[in-house]
Swiss-Prot record:
Keyword DNA damage tagged: no
Entry keyword set: ATP-binding, Cytoplasm, Glycolysis, Kinase, Nucleotide-binding, Transferase
Binding-site residues, ATP: 206, 297, 328, 357-360
Gene symbol of the encoding locus: pgk
SUPFAM superfamilies named among the record's database cross-references: Phosphoglycerate kinase
Subunit and partners: Monomer.
Organism: Synechococcus elongatus (strain ATCC 33912 / PCC 7942 / FACHB-805)
EC number: 2.7.2.3
Subcellular location as annotated: Cytoplasm
The name this protein goes by in its record: Phosphoglycerate kinase
Pathway: Carbohydrate degradation; glycolysis; pyruvate from D-glyceraldehyde 3-phosphate: step 2/5
Record GO terms (molecular function): ADP binding; ATP binding; phosphoglycerate kinase activity
GO BP term (any one): gluconeogenesis
Binding-site residues, substrate: 24-26, 40, 63-66, 122, 155
Length: 402
């Protein structure tokens, strides 16, 4: 289902109009309240700049953290407003609340081209409840709605879905449009062979993705802690590694489905095991059928990396979601980092490489190859749900393309 986008609105449509833009500024802060990664803020800049340069009054709305429906001082958007102001090279007005008389007055005083950031929308419980009156109050601040928050598009909240009942037009911003184009095309119309790399600790959190990808891809490479559930399902001893005992039958059925569909399903052949879950653990590499009792697998081994790289070599499209090991610990980050470098090499050869949100994004950034990927998704849960073939409420609520 194609949606109307910001590109369909000209400067004449936008000049002097109040445009409510849902952005995803849920960025990480350090202990001193300083932003440690401004990727999500930067990702929204093309939409903000286009609106501002077209003479619109730009009103940004975002959530930040989980304040549970009440104001929390450490979750105010002040550091975000400061960083955005630096990136835009102009002042950004931050309101003291997302709705109400104060916000209304500050928006009313806004001149064409100016940018206003509303205070954390989740300070109101009505946001996550998709309350109609709250949505109406947000909508009253604007004439036009733009959703550029892919990271929150899988939520039916007041600022992502409810407001669209009271504003028109409602369109996708540049970031949301790009996300949908890349992820949808990768699933619906990929250049083949298409490989999917799925990692992370639990099969349970990736069931939907694996099942959908088995219908779409030519090769499925599995890494991360979830591999041990597959091994145990095959009758192997996994030592003290993480296993979801209640998912053994599911693992067997996924392996059977891959075989039935002719999908090459690759599991690691060796793993790096540790005597404890810690950065300074004793570690060694063993074959998957030789994990010692009491030791736990925390990364894929060098033979597995080689095998994965060989499987990926001829692929024209690759989707990656989830790390190969516990990459927060340097000695167990080798597998994840090797896959990141391998994908950068594939991009250089003309393949389409898509990093589907979450920890995989942190991995390619840590290795310094983020700019060499075709597309890096800004949404964790949203990209997973899109890859699962689900309809995202924040997208469904937008106007259909003419």
């Amino acid at each position: 289902m194609s949606k109307r986008t910001l590109a369909s609105l000209t400067a004449a449509d936008l000049e002097g109009k109040r445009v409510l833009v849902r952005v995803d500024f849920n960025v990480p802060l350090d202990g001193n309240g300083k932003i440690t990664d401004d990727t999500r803020i930067r990702a929204a800049l093309p939409t903000i700049r286009y609106l501002s340069e077209s003479g619109a009054k730009v009103i940004l709305v975002s959530h930040f953290g989980r304040p549970k429906g009440k104001p929390v001082e450490s979750m105010r958007l002040t550091p975000v407003a400061e960083r955005l102001s630096e990136l835009l090279g102009r002042p950004v007005v931050k309101t003291t609340d997302a709705v109400g008389a104060g916000a209304e007055a500050q928006v009313a005083a806004t001149s064409n081209g100016q940018v206003v950031l509303l205070e954390n929308v989740r300070f109101h419980a009505e946001e996550e409840a998709n309350d109609a009156e709250f949505a109406k109050a947000l909508a009253s601040l604007a004439d036009i709605y733009v959703n550029d928050a892919f990271g929150a598009a899988h939520r039916a909240h007041a600022s992502t879905a409810g407001v669209t009942e009271y504003l028109s037009p409602c369109v996708a911003g540049y970031l949301l449009e790009k996300e949908l184009q890349y992820l949808q095309a990768a699933i619906d119309n990929p250049q083949r062979p298409l490989a999917a790399i799925v990692g992370g600790s639990k099969v349970s959190s990736k069931i939907g993705v694996i099942e959908t990808l088995l219908d779409k891809c030519d090769k499925l490479l599995i890494g991360g802690g979830m591999i041990f559930t597959f091994y145990k399902a095959q009758g192997l001893s996994v030592g003290g590694s993480l296993v979801e005992e209640d998912k053994l039958d599911l693992a067997r059925s996924l392996m059977a489905k891959a075989q039935e569909k002719g999908v090459q399903l690759l599991l690691p052949v060796d793993v790096v095991v540790a005597d404890k879950f810690a950065p300074d653990a004793n570690a060694k590499t063993v074959a998957i059928d030789a994990i010692p009792d009491g030791w736990m697998g925390l990364d894929i081994g060098p033979e597995s990396v080689k095998q994965f790289e060989e499987a990926l070599a001829d692929c024209r499209s690759v989707i990656w979601n989830g790390p190969m090991g516990v990459f927060e610990f340097d000695q167990f980050a080798v597998g994840t980092e090797a896959i990141a470098r391998s994908l950068a090499g594939l991009t250089r050869k003309g393949a389409t490489t898509i990093i589907g949100g979450g920890d995989s994004v942190a991995a390619v950034e840590k290795v310094g190859v983020a700019s060499e990927m075709s597309h890096i998704s800004t949404g964790g849960g949203a990209s997973l749900e899109l890859l699962e073939g689900k309809v995202l409420p924040g997208v469904a609520a937008l106007d259909d393309a003419a």
